[in-house]
Amino acid sequence: NESQNVENEECQSIVNHYRRTGIHATVEKTEYSGIYRSRYILKELPLVSIVIPNKDHVDDLKKCINSLEEKCNYENKEYVIVENNSTENKTFEYYDELIKKCSCASVIYWKEKGFNYSKINNYGARFAKGEYILFLNNDTEIQNSDFLQEMLGYCMRKDVGAVGAQMFYEDGTIQHAGVIVGLGGLASHPYAGAPKETYGHMGRIHAVQELSAVT
């Protein structure tokens, strides 16, 4: 039908643009009319360091690591756990267990008192061996197996400095889809609390886009 032909032409125009500009990527339709997904073809598979701050809450950390091990199909990665003054024995027992079974995991110790998320992550980054760093909370669980390839495709572009991913609460509502300066005051998260299926303004929530910040 006519709309199908229009979508095919729109999709092909993006492909042609990539060819003219020397960008190695494929383009595919999404379930949303007028929104297309570009997949950048990785010429190399660089080491990605996944920095995870942790203080006790070992059950959350286990779920996080297990989801990475079971669902993430990007193999060239390492885990840098930043231990932040935990007190429970089972936390340190898990660290020992993780290091024994996973050669790509390491635990470093942050000994300052008090909580400063930025300083703890920056400290962990000093021990990262990877060319790219993924900062991840210990209560995060991975949903898509190709999320690292997807993020790397954008990270490896010369005009991109930082990349974020959509995050969802357990009930399927949106936790994070970027930050917009001036929204609701100084800055805020657009679509926070909305169902993941929400269409939003012109379907923007379902498209890769530039934002003021990511977290």
What would you call each of these model-derived segments?
Residues 84, 136-139:
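Active-site acidic Asp-centered loop
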Residues 118-119, 126, 174, 180-215:
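A recurrent flexible, glycine/aromatic-enriched loop bordering the glycosyltransferase active site
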